[in-house]
Amino acid sequence: SMKGLLDFHRAHGKVGTIMVTRVEEPAKYGKSVVLSHETGLIDRFVEHGRTYHGNWINAGVYIFSPSIFERIALRPTSMEREVLPELAADDQLYSRQLDGFWMNVKKPREWIEGNALYLSHLRTERPAALLAAGGGDGGDGGSSSGGGSGGAPALGASSAVEGNVLMDASATVGDDCLIGPDVTIGPNCVIGSGVRLAHCVLLEGVKVGAHACVFDSILGWRATVGEWTRVEGVSVLGEDVHLGSEVCLNGALILPHKKLDTSVTTPQIIM
């Protein structure tokens, strides 16, 4: 936890503390962290080569004392390539092992996979936060609050939940929908009747028209998807993007505040 990391940082009294995690293939993540398992003191960071240096890597969560600013040059400076190695060389950098799951998220596909990983974590640790599997009855569908406030989300008649689904209490789902698996629906989203959602993330204020399908994609704030439209192939809709009816989107990245009424069948960026 972050509180545990902060308490550990205050206890050792040095300049920095970083979270580290153990991975099966450290070569995929750049440098390994060589550390003392007894104290957590970091000895050095090493590039992956022919010599094995362990499976611990930088998890990207840092806590520093204010004196860190004295060590950052007044020029473009890399924290990972310059500052952290110098702290380690001066015995001023400690590590704390991450409890729980971790994933490196840099690309849309990784965000979608990370969302599934988080929902799986909720299934184990806080199952009441997820929608209950099964069908809706025009009310709460037998679901919990889905992490929102103000009661349970509304599922329309004959709508069903499959697998892990996190839905804010202010969102609504129409009749005859199939939601899941691995779907997150943010606040004030409106899902029309007959919609199919799977392996996707809908941020706040998204509206999906009747009979649309969204698979393996991310819909940004206040985006709208027209009726009978299909979004798939790791497509990303920026904020305030509006798709017309009967449009097919496959692997498209659409920048914010765009309106699109034609299909995009090959991966590309729409500016």
Put a short name on every predicted segment.
Residues Y29, A59, E162-G163, D168, ...:
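Short loop/turn microsegments at loop-to-beta-strand junctions
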Residues M19-V20:
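Generic beta-sheet signal
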Residues S1-G4, E110, R196, C213:
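Residue-level recognition of oxygen-bearing side chains
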Residues G142, G147, S193-M271:
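Glycine-rich hexapeptide-repeat left-handed beta-helix
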Residues H53-I57, I185, L237:
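A short, polar/proline- and glycine-enriched secondary-structure boundary/capping micro-motif
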Residues K3-A11, V23-A27, S36-R126:
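Catalytic-core segments of class I nucleotidyltransferases/pyrophosphorylases
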Residues A88-G205:
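Extended, small-residue-rich solenoid/repeat segments and analogous flexible loops
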